[in-house]
Amino acid sequence: FALAHMVNDFDILKSYLDEGANGVETDITFSDEGEPEYAFHGVPCDCKRWCRRTVGFNEYLQHVRDLSTPGNPKFREHFIAIVLDLKLNGLSQEALAHGGMRLADKLIAYYWAHGRNATRITFIVSVPKTSEKVFLKTFLEEIKAVGYDDMLSKVAFDFTDNGDFSETQKVFEGLGIHEHIWASDGITNCIPMLFRGTSRLEDLIRQRDVPGYKYISKVYAWTYDKETSVVKALELGVDGVMTNYADFVIGIINKPEHSSKYRLATYQDNPFEKFVKSA
């Protein structure tokens, strides 16, 4: 997966899809009460990016529904994944609980309700911290309560706090989430990978590849903009790279030394199937 980073309005979405990205990451902001309101990041953000692009969340979902529905004039065949980077910092537990329910409601009303079996996006619901787990609890409860639990086949889950994954697994177990987990590791592109290192990323990949282990389906790295970082991630065996330069990452994947081992995922590929790195 070549995941375009910080895609918060329609112009930049078009630009990244034109570059060939098969997935995007979008930042979702919430009111103090927990209502999902906008695709928006704000300052500070990644280096060499404009931080203030924005669009209403309802409009965003309607637009990506058009882009991901076969037969729609706007359909983009290669567009198959969206990481919803949920900006939950500062919300009370009550607001987090409301937010999870309302995110489910909005996905149903503005994305799935007009063709639940026709649309193609897998949503990765990305929560910043395990202490915000009640958000996922109410998200799941609401989807099941209104009879859309079949659409959980198109949903993955992630905590992005870069914590000890053995502890993260316990949180997933407590939530009753035993599959469809996309684990991630990363930091802003303003800090070189050299300073962060790849030890945690390597640990996630090793854990993913343990036979019979089900709590990691995919591993992606963020936010990689340099060739050395992207090549290192591919060599380690990641399933996805989040980047500010999708065409650059795709170009690296298509180089002869990588194209024999990697290709961009398509809709025909299972977003929860493990592709274990061979020895």
Curated annotation (Swiss-Prot):
The active site is at residues 5, 41. Its EC number is 4.6.1.-. GO terms for biological process: killing of cells of another organism; lipid catabolic process. Binds 1 Mg(2+) ion per subunit. Expressed by the venom gland. Its main location: secreted. It catalyses: an N-(acyl)-sphingosylphosphocholine = an N-(acyl)-sphingosyl-1,3-cyclic phosphate + choline; an N-(acyl)-sphingosylphosphoethanolamine = an N-(acyl)-sphingosyl-1,3-cyclic phosphate + ethanolamine; a 1-acyl-sn-glycero-3-phosphocholine = a 1-acyl-sn-glycero-2,3-cyclic phosphate + choline; a 1-acyl-sn-glycero-3-phosphoethanolamine = a 1-acyl-sn-glycero-2,3-cyclic phosphate + ethanolamine. Disulfide bonds join 45-51, 47-190. InterPro entries: PLC-like_Pdiesterase_TIM-brl. Keywords: Cytolysis, Dermonecrotic toxin, Disulfide bond, Hemolysis, Lipid degradation, Lipid metabolism, Lyase, Magnesium, Metal-binding, Secreted, Toxin. Its cofactor is Mg(2+). Mg(2+) binds at residues 25, 27, 85. It comes from the Eukaryota. CDD domains: GDPD_like_SMaseD_PLD (cd08576). GO terms for cellular component: extracellular region. It is found in: Secreted. GO terms for molecular function: lyase activity; metal ion binding; phosphoric diester hydrolase activity; toxin activity. Dermonecrotic toxins cleave the phosphodiester linkage between the phosphate and headgroup of certain phospholipids (sphingolipid and lysolipid substrates), forming an alcohol (often choline) and a cyclic phosphate. This toxin acts on sphingomyelin (SM). It may also act on ceramide phosphoethanolamine (CPE), lysophosphatidylcholine (LPC) and lysophosphatidylethanolamine (LPE), but not on lysophosphatidylserine (LPS), and lysophosphatidylglycerol (LPG). It acts by transphosphatidylation, releasing exclusively cyclic phosphate products as second products. Belongs to the arthropod phospholipase D family. Class II subfamily. This is Dermonecrotic toxin LspiSicTox-betaIE3i. It comes from Loxosceles spinulosa (Recluse spider).
